[in-house]
Amino acid sequence: MTFRQATKEDLPSIIEMIANDTLGHLRERFEDPLPKEYYNAFESIDGDRNQELMVIENSEGEVVASFQLSFLQYLTYVGGIRCLVENVHVREDQTGKGIGKQMFQWIIERAKEKGVHLVQLTSNKLRPNAIRFYEGIGFKATHEGFKLHL
């Protein structure tokens, strides 16, 4: 497995994984060509030093997973840094092969390199398998999350 920063050329593979997700098929637009909004978002993420959009390639060079890390400076924890993990996706035909565990081992090491004191994520309640996975690798459901769609 190779972990690397995503490039613009990876966007079709990333968006396809997101669109094939339980909820993604309801809100994403995986089309050829991709809507320009995805490329605009990529440019914004890529230009922000506190964001890392990553992909994982298999030995054949195929993108089999992706995730995004946001490093957030806080005043709490004596000015600590949190790592927010978002958009975790493993290609459907690659689930159950240990990619998720390798991904989170890599994420935790990267967070330590950046001086992070806390790694956090959210998972939709409609994804019970993902929730079990996160609990199985040590994450704890410690807070109630709230969202307001605009």
Regions found by a protein language model. Name each.
Residues 87-90, 96-109, 136:
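Conserved acetyl-CoA-binding loop-helix of GNAT-fold acetyltransferases
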Residues 74-85, 95, 142:
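A conserved beta-turn-beta hairpin within the catalytic core of GNAT-like acetyltransferases
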Residues 2-16:
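A short beta-loop-alpha structural element at the N-terminal edge
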Residues 22-41:
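Conserved GNAT-fold acetyl-CoA-binding loop/helix
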Residues 104, 111-122:
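Conserved GNAT acetyl-CoA-binding A-motif
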Residues 101, 125-143, 148:
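Conserved active-site alpha-helix within GNAT-family acetyltransferase domains
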Residues 55, 62-71, 89:
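Conserved beta-strand in the GNAT
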Residues 43-55, 84:
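A short helix-loop-beta-strand connector motif used in the catalytic cores of GNAT acetyltransferases and
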